[in-house]
Amino acid sequence: LGKLLSKQTNEFYICHNYGINGETSSDLLRRSWGILKSNKGSAKICLLLIGTNDTKKPTPLSIYEDNLIQIIQSIQANGMIPIVGTLPLLTFSPYYAKNRNWTTKYNKVIKNLSEHLNFDICLMDNMEEYLIDGVHFTHEGYNEMAKRWSKKILALK
């Protein structure tokens, strides 16, 4: 993403990825303040894509919503602009077979919160073709995701 933004703008971008494999929104909430505080003043934008792992053993909608509220308000309190990605729809995976519809439920939460907390959404719709195992992206999928994030970031100008 940093390379793509630099190429498009002739400016220097550094992108940090603080994602942890298997992490839920509750896990991220526990460590988010420290991450955000350590980047206060240097990071201007915070991209957030969280919730796919919440579908494995579905996190209740009220808890997912509360986790997002706290994370997004922490982003804003640390002077950063939040952009939240919608969750890509999952295709077949044994681990998620019974809970794939939860991504749609979580996306409704994201869309509702965007109006109340005043943040932009980056749509990750129609990404199914890029899933290698029904859940995780191929290299091309991550490149497509970077293109979508970059368009949303550059639209802030």
State where each predicted segment sits.
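Alpha-helical cap/lid subdomain in secreted, periplasmic
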Residues: 4-7, 27-157
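A short beta-strand-loop structural module common to alpha/beta enzyme folds
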Residues: 8-24
